[in-house]
Amino acid sequence: MQADVIFRNADIVDGTGQTRIHGDVAIRDDRIVAVGELSKWHGGRDVDCTGLTLAPGFIDPHVHHDEALLTDPGMDCMLSQGVTTIIAGNCGFSIAPLTATIDILPQPLGMILTSTRPRFARFADYRNQLRQSPAAVNSACLIGHGTLRINEVADLGRPADAAELKAMEKSLDQALGEGGIGVSTGLFYPPARAATTAEAIAMARIARAHGKLYVTHMRDEGDQGIEALEETLEIGREACCGVHVSHHKCAGLANHGQSEITLPMFSKAMLDQDVSLDTTPWTASSTMLNSGRHRQATRVIVAESLAYPKMAGRDLADIAREWNTDLDTAMERLLPATGIFFIMDESDVRRILSFEHTIICSDGIARGDHSHPRVWGTFPRVLGHYVRDIGLFTLEEGVKRMTSMPADRFGLKDRGRIREGGYADLVLFDPATIESGATYEKPKTPAHGIKNVWVNGRESWADGANKGNRAGVVLDRDPS
């Protein structure tokens, strides 16, 4: 039998959570055509995998690379850590459909969409552009409720009125029909903070009509986190819609240990409704600079400041001392800005990671030189630190949480598993050396231990370098 490429003598972790096997994998065109003992097969190229692990390409279900897919299509930050598929449009903010004519976009949309290129008034226009100018990774996109509010609601400081809500519903219905894989909300952020629970339910009902998900950055992840989770579950129940909670965390010193309450809430809800969650493997979060958040953190690093670009990478406390002022005043001067907030407790991070239903995500945004290390290092951090060094769960379980689990949850057909007939999205890595190279001091450092990455049958990353292939495709949600 003939194949384009045969991976030989690999430890195959297939993404299902089952015990690894030793064997070979053959690919032809963009598909896996055989798995097992393939000594009688011949390949145009043989890849010796002795001592290495072959896994499905990792799937990142929560990124903010909506614009970067077009402006930085090589996607080094993703390929270098083994990611072959991403889901954008999270936290209520997608860059399409965007019909608002204002020059300065409300944050955080203004941090996600920064170029002067023409805006995409229809979601179909954005997808068509991605098809015409492919990126190096596969992509799917949620439709942001916050973006719809910016388009339709005259005063973002109040709930939508009946006419505005109807306009948002119509726009969402169209965008989902054009390939959006669900709706996302970011009720935590100013453009959507005034939205009522009923408004969110209305969005979820449109998603349900399309057989798609309601994905949410909840209204609060700190002092009101339990109430916000209750609201999220209510939205799912009332809309009869599947709910996915993004980057679940317990933020703020007063809320450390709260995962002992929230995780049982998830378990109980899962008995009666369709609920899932993802999380990141870090004790620091990253979002817009705001006073409420910095007061809950033990340390804040400025990731980016449009007003003072040279302050990126520095501690907020050091900047305040240099300016001879308090933290609040320093923060106000830096705005608009983003920060890295050391705000979670390691025990909560481990507890949430080890929860059997948790999917892994990065919550990364590819901007600037001082971003959070999660942009480049999330998935190797899980497999290196939490799997190999800490033993939080097995390698097979870790890979499952970043492959088949997100693929199944978001309806990415034939992705996330090494099996005959599946797409040839693959990552070859050394389990003894894999780890994040990114740190808070040097966040744009590629991961260690990633040998090769293949996207749809094409080698896209090898030995620390981008191969220049743009093999990514635009994905839809499979309703089955």
Over which residues does each language-model region extend?
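C-terminal cap of metal-dependent C-N hydrolases
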Residues: 351-357, 362-363, 378, 427-475
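Histidine-rich, glycine-flanked metal-binding segment
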Residues: 1-6, 11-57, 72, 436-439
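His/Asp/Glu-enriched, well-ordered alpha-helical/loop segment
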Residues: 237, 293-329, 333, 344, ...
